[in-house]
Every structure is written in structure tokens, then in C-alpha cells.
Amino acid sequence: MILEYIVTGNEMKLLDDTTSQVFLVPSVVLMEQAAAGVVRELVACFDKSKEFAVICGKGNNAGDGIAIARLLNQAGYRCMLYYAFGTDEAGSELFELQKNIYARYGFKVVSDIECVCKSDVIIDALFGTGLKRAIEGSLADVISAVNKANAYRVAVDVPSGVDSDKGHVMGCTFKADFTYTFSYKKTGLLLWPGCDYCGLVKVVPIGIDDHSFCGNLPSVRALDESDLKKLDNRPAHSNKGTFGKLLVIAGSRNMAGAAVLSAKAAYKSGAGLVKIITPECNRSIIQCALPEALLCTDITSAKALETELDWADAVVIGPGLSKSDNAKMLVETVLKTAEIPLVIDADALNIISDNMTLLNEHKMPVIVTPHLGEMSRLMKKSIVNIQEDIIGVAGEFASLYNVTCVLKDFRTIIAAADGEKFINLSGNCGMATAGSGDVLSGIVGGLLVQLRDTKKAAAYGAFIHGLAGDMVFDNTGSYGMIASDIIDGLDKVWIKVEKNGN
């Protein structure tokens, strides 16, 4: 995979230090390049009729801000500087250097926040990635004032008040229209609620690249559309067996739709053959809705199920399954006897949550796809506690049970047992609809029988699921989207993949 690294505040500080200490690039050079990069973006967006104001703290983020103000003035723009701690407050070494340089030029400094609020563009350089406390008191008053101003708001690296690691909002927080972050996106810019304060996020190169990791690569990454080019083209000399056989164990009385959605999504993701195990009462519905699917009904013994498992290359189990005694038998048999990879979703997870020892029974690679409620039951943690550290919780679960965990939320987190994690950046709020998770399980299962790699199937599956939703958003909007629309969007995704691949 081609991967975009996502870093924490501490990882970014280590990169800064490594670039300076190992590669001998002075910190002030990095700061100047950071400022110049932000100014290039601003000049591309705003003409010289606009007046700028930079609000500064007293750390290195403020140093970036002062350098930005100086470069804007030197480029012929009107820009004022506001020191939130006052002009006499001492700060970091680089802050003091930039402050002195700015003073030598004699560019404008103001002490009245009302002057700042009258400008056209307000740039936040109060706090950077190191902030770990709530913004209160007079600093909160400053941020509150500029948030109310009739101006564009730009954040330098991270909006002040956003935790750069976990996306928490700490006290009064700067509400940006644009965030120019340095070298790599920070995890907190992508997670809720911090992402709501970032506006459009753009990475500004400053001279730090992957060399500065010195082999210690970040554990969190993201996929984008360019990664889809890495999916293999389907060979011309192929048949339905070439693309794998998926067994979907899904549906119960009044829940036939879950089986249809999952199986159809698997077919639409390229699986060669899909067989559904479901109660006999669902037969007519499924055969009408998805005539392409093979059907096996009323499996009521472990022996009968084992025969079907021998047919398949992978299993999806759980969508609409219920928690009946027969459903419990199906889940237990699959976990204890299957010698093929598994995708465990929905009611299968709810059954497991009542007996977590079941998850230690699996012989083959497993992908679990819980939403927050299901993860709460699995981990015996509140949803609030999970949301406070969603990446950490997904990673903990993956490691504890040796599975790949697809933890579904506003930003779905994919965590592998080896410690590698992905943040999915595709998708939209229209996808928060009944059956969306069934579609995801089918996509992941469909990819799994082709890729034979749980990590890739989970990561690509989550991304493609979101991208399919994005593809149909213009037709449905957020109110009108239903799970079947997401399946329709898969056609557009694969057409794009094949065109780009060729």
C-alpha cells in the first residue's frame, strides 16, 4: 500500500529534533520554511486588499506565527501582530529570536484585540501540538473574540485548543476555516470533535520527510484514492472460482435484508461466488432480491455447517443473525472449527460479548467490525471512554484477541494485531443509516476472498465503503442515502479503479 503517515504531537516533536540533530538542519531553518509554506498558501487564497492579523502565544508555534507575519509584510501585505501574553512575556528561544527580528523591521504590533477582530484574516499561532490543558481565562476571551469576528480564520499547525493526539477539545478553542499543518497530518485533526474546528486541512512541507523517522515509522496511517491503484487488475484468463468463494451466515426472521445487503456488497466488490446461510423463511425474499446468490437454509447442526465451511475461502458471520440458540451454535462452530479467514459482525459480536472466551478459539485470521455500542459490550467500557481514545481502544482489542479490528465511528479505525493502524478518511454522514454496516461486512468479505490478507481487506474495505458513499452523495444527499445506495456507489468506485489502473 501507498500510505499517508499520521503522527501524534510527540512524534512530530521527535521528527523536528531528529531533523535538527541527526541531519543538522537548524530548527530556525525549519521554522522559516514552515512560515514560508503557510504564506505561499495564504498568498494563493487572498489578495493584497485583505488585512491580516496574527495572534501569538510564546512558544515555537508563536515563533511560526511571527515569521508568517513578517513574511506577509515583506510580501506587501498588511499584517499586524498581537501578543496574547503581552510584549514583555518571555518565551521559547525561537520565539524570542523571531520576536526580535520582527521588532527590527518595525512591523505593526497591536495590543487591542478589537483591532485584530477588524482584520479580514486572523491567524492563530497561540498554541501548537504541545498543548495539554484547557484554555481558560484571558486567553479564552481572546479566542472567543476572534471566533465571533467577521473574518477568515487560519490555524498554524493545529487550532489552539485541539488536542493534537486524540482530537479532544480543551476549553475555548479556535474555530478555523483553514488549518495548515506541518509535514504530516496530526491524529487529533482527523478525529471528532477536534476535526470540527479545523476547517480545510492542508499539509505544508517544511523540509522534514520520512528520512527523519530513522526507521521508526508511525503506527497510524491513512489511505487515499491513490492507494486503490495498488489493487491488482483482474486477469482476463479467469473464471468465477478465480475470485474466491464467500460464505455469508446472516439473516433471521424479519432480517432477510441484512443477508441481502452483505451478500450483494460482496458480489459488487468482486467475489466470484457468494453463498448465504439463512433460515428457510428468508428464501423467497433473498432469491428475488439477489438471484446470483447460492442459498443454504436451516443449518441446525455443527456437522452440516462444517460441510459448508469446507466449500468457502472466507466467512462473513453476523449481519441480522439474531441471538437465538441456533445463531449461537453457528457462531461457536465457526470460531472453533473454521480453517478459513473470518469477518465477524453485528449479532455474532453480541453473542461473543456474552462469552469472550469464544474469541480465543479462532484458528485462522479474524476481522471484527464493531460499532461503538458493540465495542462497548465487547470491552466492557462505556462509549464515552472508547471515544476518548478510539485509536488506543481499537489497538488494544486487536492485540488482546489477535484480530484485525474495524471500529466503526465518524472516523473508522482499523487496527491490526501487529500494532499497525489506519484512520479511514472517506465517507459522509449520509452513511449513518440502517444496513450500512452490513454493506461494509460484505465489502470486506468480498475483498478478503480475493486478497487473502485480513489487514488489506479491512483497510481497503473501510475506505472503499466510505468512497462508495461519497460517490452517491451528490445524487442522494445526506438525508436520502440508504444502504442500497452505497452498494450502487461501488460500481462507480470500481470503474474509477480500473480506469486509473489502466
Regions found by a protein language model. Give the residues of each.
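Internal gly/pro-rich beta-alpha loop/helix module
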Residues: 120-121, 126-218
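Glycine-rich phosphate-binding loop
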Residues: 112, 120-134, 315-322, 412
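Short, small-residue-enriched loops and turns at beta-alpha junctions
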Residues: 87-89, 129-131, 323-324, 350-351
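Short beta->alpha connector loops at strand-helix junctions that form conserved
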Residues: 83-85, 113-116, 183, 296-299, ...
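Amphipathic alpha-helical segments in well-structured domains
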Residues: 95, 99, 139-143, 176, ...
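Nucleotide and nucleotide-moiety/phosphate-recognizing core
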Residues: 39-125, 134-156
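Glycine-rich, charge-decorated loop segments at or immediately adjacent to ligand/cofactor-binding or catalytic sites
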Residues: 93, 159-173, 349-361
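Small-residue (G/A/S/T)-rich helix-start motifs and N-terminal tracts that mark the onset
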Residues: 1-80, 189-342, 346, 350-367, ...
